[in-house]
């Protein structure tokens, strides 16, 4: 499992230009079962995506499809972890 931590490199006005394309990208990976949750950071300096992927390479290939990545709107920190304890029902996502 992976956490994608996005930090904006551009002003919000630039982020907004690519926001719909980013939302479409998110929806694609929710439909494929890769994305579990996502949302904005508070304050709005970037976002977080929780992703299920079989390898670091697959997670990177998913990141590289994001319009925010393609247009250098955000930088990404990729954090891999193994959930060892989780809430009831979360096992559906592991």
List PLM regions with ranges.
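Conserved, structured core segments of small domains
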Residues: 1-94
């Amino acid at each position: 499992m992976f956490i994608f931590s996005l930090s904006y490199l551009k002003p919000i006005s630039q982020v907004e230009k690519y926001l719909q394309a980013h939302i479409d990208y998110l929806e694609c990976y929710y439909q494929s079962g890769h994305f579990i949750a996502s949302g904005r950071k508070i304050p709005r300096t970037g976002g977080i995506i929780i992703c299920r992927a079989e390898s670091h390479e697959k997670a990177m290939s998913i990141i590289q499809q994001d319009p925010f990545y393609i247009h250098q709107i955000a930088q990404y920190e990729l954090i891999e972890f193994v959930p060892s304890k989780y809430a009831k029902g979360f096992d559906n996502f592991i």
